[in-house]
């Protein structure tokens, strides 16, 4: 259900803006998106797991706020990120 440390490192390498970057908005959104995908798969088979559903909604809101921040600060980075992650449009 949770993502492994190896998968997290792969995401950090893929979405980092520079060497050693683990906290940029792009990396955080990518990790959140992976966790959201995993939790969505879990909820497809465990429909009554409402505690996990609440966690999912919290993560989606957190990702939304992070994307809003990125859009306000640098629209080009925002557009590139949602394109790479396959989020909306």
Swiss-Prot record:
GO terms for cellular component: cytosolic small ribosomal subunit. It comes from the Bacteria. Keywords: Ribonucleoprotein, Ribosomal protein, RNA-binding, rRNA-binding. The keyword Iron-sulfur does not apply. CDD domains: Ribosomal_S15p_S13e. The keyword Coiled coil does not apply. GO terms for biological process: translation. One of its GO terms (molecular function) is structural constituent of ribosome. Pfam families: Ribosomal_S15. Belongs to the universal ribosomal protein uS15 family. NCBIfam families: S15_bact. One of the primary rRNA binding proteins, it binds directly to 16S rRNA where it helps nucleate assembly of the platform of the 30S subunit by binding and bridging several RNA helices of the 16S rRNA. Part of the 30S ribosomal subunit. Forms a bridge to the 50S subunit in the 70S ribosome, contacting the 23S rRNA. This is Small ribosomal subunit protein uS15.
